[in-house]
């Protein structure tokens, strides 16, 4: 097929896009702005804004007109209040980050061989393994993004610890920037994974014995 990315320049571009996608996806894992909660003042809970992340939640509350306090709580594996989409995203995003790291490692090895014009089976296999790992990383990221996006759209609640003084559901819930960053990182991971997976050794890379003239 004509869209196979077999040239060195094309594969180096693929590697650059893969790196961008991996960085965006890995960065989103540490961001806290996955779900934004806006909470009004009630008799049970004080007003404030909460950023619900995959590994922690940060709560911002205005004490005076010029003072805002911030409190962050990092989830532990003993926390049973975490909903399915967050528990799943914790595992999926970490797995995707590891897969993406090793996918880049195999891609670098294949590019090294290509730059040295070593078009052998090891080069082909490295591109294929890199493609599989990058696609798997992209799929894991995509599932985590879609699950948490769906939770925001459907206004799903979370039963936080009483000490956090947060309601089960906020008055307003919005999609945070972390979901957008993770979503942007999915596309290059999937596309570059496809290009690497279907890499074909160019005909000129095949080694033929030379014929000496008498």
Curated annotation (Swiss-Prot):
**TM ranges:** 12-32, 81-101, 126-146, 178-198
Taken from the UniProt entry, a GO cellular component term is: bicellular tight junction
Q: Which family does it belong to?
A: Belongs to the claudin family.
Q: Native species of this protein?
A: Homo sapiens
Subcellular localization = Cell junction, Tight junction; Cell membrane
Its annotated function is as follows: Plays a major role in tight junction-specific obliteration of the intercellular space, through calcium-independent cell-adhesion activity.
User: What quaternary arrangement does the UniProt entry report?
Assistant: Can form homo- and heteropolymers with other CLDN.
Q: What InterPro entries has UniProt attached to this entry?
A: Claudin
Q: Which UniProt keywords apply?
A: Cell junction, Cell membrane, Membrane, Tight junction, Transmembrane, Transmembrane helix
Q: Which residues lie on this side of the membrane: Extracellular?
A: 33-80, 147-177
Main location class: other
Q: Biological process GO terms, please?
A: bicellular tight junction assembly; cell adhesion
| Name of this chain's protein | Claudin-34
Membrane topology note: Multi-pass membrane protein
Q: Name one GO molecular function term.
A: structural molecule activity
Q: Which residues lie on this side of the membrane: Cytoplasmic?
A: 1-11, 102-125, 199-214
Domain of life of the organism encoding this protein: Eukaryota
């Amino acid at each position: 097929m004509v869209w196979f990315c077999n040239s060195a320049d094309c594969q180096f571009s693929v590697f650059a896009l893969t790196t961008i996608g991996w960085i965006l996806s890995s960065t989103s894992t540490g961001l806290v702005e996955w779900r934004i909660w806006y909470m009004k003042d009630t008799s049970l809970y004080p007003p404030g804004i909460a950023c619900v992340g995959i590994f922690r939640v940060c709560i911002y509350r205005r004490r005076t007109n010029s003072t805002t306090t911030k409190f962050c709580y990092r989830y532990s594996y003993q926390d049973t209040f975490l909903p399915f989409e967050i528990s799943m995203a914790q595992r999926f995003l970490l797995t995707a980050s590891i897969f993406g790291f090793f996918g880049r490692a195999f891609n670098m090895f294949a590019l090294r061989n290509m730059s040295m014009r070593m078009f052998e089976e090891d080069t082909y296999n490295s591109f294929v393994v890199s493609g599989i790992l990058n696609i798997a990383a992209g799929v894991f990221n995509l599932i985590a993004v879609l699950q948490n996006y769906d939770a925001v759209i459907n206004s799903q609640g979370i039963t936080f610890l009483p000490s956090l003084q947060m309601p089960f559901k906020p008055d307003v819930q919005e999609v945070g920037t972390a979901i957008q960053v993770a979503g942007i990182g999915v596309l290059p991971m999937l596309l570059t994974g496809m290009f690497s997976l279907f890499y074909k050794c160019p005909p000129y890379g095949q080694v033929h014995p030379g014929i000496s003239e008498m």
